[in-house]
Amino acid sequence: MRIARFSINGTPRYAFVQEDEQDGKDYLVELSGYPLTGQQVEPTGQRYALDDEKVRLLAPVIPSKIYGAAKNYRAHAAYMAEKGQSPSPEPPERLVLFMKPSTSVIGPDDPIVKPSYSKDMNYEPEVAVVIGRIARKVSQAEAMDYVLGYTCVNDVTLRDLQQDDPMWTRCKGFDTACPLGPWIETDLDYRDAKISFRLNGEEVPEASGTTADLIHSIPEQIAFISSFATLLPGDVIMTGTPHASGSLQGRDEATVHVEGIGDLRNVVIDE
């Protein structure tokens, strides 16, 4: 099931994304409530074609908090060391986290604004987990019961600021640094979700990977975070970028693809 957040004439709404069996097009079936409240939601009877010019897809959630897993793939840890961005090619033994503010979130087709004070802005394609229930001190065995679904995320990073920003607050938390979307997919094999990235329409093979290669699994990440912080419905965990990242310049088109979810596309503009 795909759950989307969208707007018509500026009013945010939620919908199921469903394919019409007759014309093969995707439609937004509007819902009466907010799926993350735990209350039952019902179709309102309104539906809109996904390609309707009046429809604007929004980020599927505005989280109260966003966690990111640092160097959670061996290939990415080695890549960062090779580029001089990390002192060691070995990933950390324990899960290392950083955070992004909710103000960094943008949706599909929203512009990524490259700050004027940075000369090296990078993409990082990832799978994001969306929490569906309040989670506090949950075990790995029960962690997946607290997941609503998954979406694409681009963990946009100002690489030239990262070395001088040990907490990564500015280099990863600036406005527009967290594109999310296009929707939440509730049915995804999180153990082997394939990630790829296209820059200006061309696939970047060295940026691709699969969650099968995660060092710290999704259940492990949820259990660890919930051991010290309460996760709320709509909170997001960025699970890690699989391999290489690369530079983004003004007018570049950045597309994160996760098999089973779809495409998250954004264009870069200079501040």
PLM features: residue spans?
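Buried hydrophobic positions in well-ordered alpha/beta secondary-structure cores of metabolic enzymes
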Residues: 3, 15, 98, 129, ...
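A structural-propensity feature for long, helix-poor, extended segments
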Residues: 103-128
